[in-house]
Amino acid sequence: MNNEIAEQIKGMLVERLRIPADELEYDSELFGEDIGLDSIDSIEIIVGIENLFGVDLSGAAREDFRSIETLTAYVEAHKEG
């Protein structure tokens, strides 16, 4: 896992969704009991990642949004350059 990308994603989640940084681990379930985000929050995540990394998330599966780790893996696999 690319820690730089993971930290950028974590920072974006903290900023956009106002999640306390100390509650957000790389493997925290974003849409489960850990953090409890909803479908509106997923839109914020999509916009944030697309703007931050220039990655198109339209082909992403639900599993790609499970945690910072899975989001990082998706960005690594689809980022140009």
Regions found by a protein language model. Give the residues of each.
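Phosphopantetheine-dependent thiolation modules in NRPS/PKS and related acyl-activating systems
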Residues: 2-36, 45-47, 51-81
